Amino acid sequence: MATDIKTRWLLTTSALFLAVLGVALSFLPQEILALTGAPAAPRLVLLVQLSGAMALAWAILNWMSRGQRFGGIYNRPLTLANVLHFATGSVTLLKMMTAGAVGLPEVVLVVPYVVLALWWAAALVTSPV
């Protein structure tokens, strides 16, 4: 029971984070590009909006899975996908930051990405019973 509550919190937290990120990327692409110092070229705007669509899709997948059992063999594909997403995102953001690209967007994203990567990794190796 306690594990179900913990994974419900994990799914809710990651869904809300990805939903906020997805809405921002989908509806404010020019503003986000300006914040990062990137030009608002049409193809970059398109890539930002497509990234937002993917974040929204991921958010709804996590949100709709909140009532399911996680850990061990239960919902392993979704757990692995979340581990891969947040771990890869964390490494990418940390790599950018160590290369000297430390701005508000990186700082705002790196903390939740690292926390969620570790949380999902823990869910991957935790038994639900």
Report the location of each language-model feature.
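Core segments of alpha-helical transmembrane spans in multipass integral membrane proteins
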Residues: 19-24, 44-67, 80-90
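Non-cytosolic membrane-interface motifs at loop->transmembrane helix junctions
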Residues: 36-45, 74-77, 101-111
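Residues within membrane-spanning alpha-helices of integral membrane proteins
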Residues: 8, 15, 52-55, 79-86, ...
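Membrane-helix boundary elements
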Residues: 8-10, 21-46
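Membrane-water interface at the C-terminal end of transmembrane alpha helices
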Residues: 115-129
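Short, Lys/Arg-rich, polar N-terminal cytosolic tail immediately upstream
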Residues: 1-7
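Juxtamembrane helix-break-helix junctions at the cytosolic face
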Residues: 62-75, 97-98
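Membrane-helix boundary connector in multi-pass membrane proteins
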Residues: 91-108, 124-125
